A protein has these predicted regions:
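S-adenosylmethionine/decaboxylated-SAM
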Residues: 23
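N-terminal signal peptide c-region/cleavage motif recognized by signal peptidases
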Residues: 19-20
């Protein structure tokens, strides 16, 4: 495993941990999981979205281009998320250790908020969260076709309302608080 692939795998693992609850409690019913997933985005998006469980199991087939996943039990730091196809492709491509590029903007909603163990270092695991950990309230995330478009934005949530997670890496994501 090359260092580049190790970094990519770690970043994607962190992203998945932030956005998809890998430790979903079995006590949540299918209906509760669907309701949790739908809470991630505005109703006009989530009402027709495909809903996947944390492990990728189809909970509900959708009719629009969005895919949503439920959050975990309260206190788990796992939050519901809804992604457009670009964000889904980014997650899958980087997870596979492949390069990613896009000509269009990718969108993701996390209206219940989210948690990053470290906004600067994509290698930090949830269990190792420290001084750079950050909880963000309701927000959306953007993947941009060019990192040059983000040069004017801070990589520190303490500096700006809108900021870039993993600033200076190939995995920059814009966080837009709502």
């Amino acid at each position: 495993l090359s260092l580049d692939n190790l970094v990519k795998s770690t970043i994607v693992a962190l992203f998945v941990l932030l956005s998809a609850p890998v430790a979903m409690a079995d006590e949540m019913s299918k209906e509760e999981k669907i309701a949790s997933a739908m809470s991630a985005a505005p109703a006009r998006i989530s009402k027709d979205a495909t809903i996947l469980d944390a492990d990728g199991t189809l909970l509900r087939e959708g009719t629009n281009r969005w895919t949503c996943k439920p959050g975990g039990p309260p206190g788990s730091r796992d939050y519901p998320i809804c992604n457009d196809p670009v964000f889904v492709e980014w997650s899958e491509t980087v997870w596979q250790g492949k390069p990613f590029s896009t000509d269009v903007v990718g969108y993701s909603y996390m209206l219940a908020g989210g948690f990053a163990p470290d906004v600067f270092d994509p290698d930090v695991e949830k269990s190792d969260a420290g001084a750079n950990a950050h909880h963000e309230g309701p927000h959306m995330m953007l993947i941009m076709p060019s990192h040059d478009l983000l040069a004017h934005l801070s990589g520190d949530p303490k500096d700006e309302d809108i900021f870039v997670v993993f600033k200076g890496t190939d995995y920059e994501i814009v966080i837009v608080p709502l």
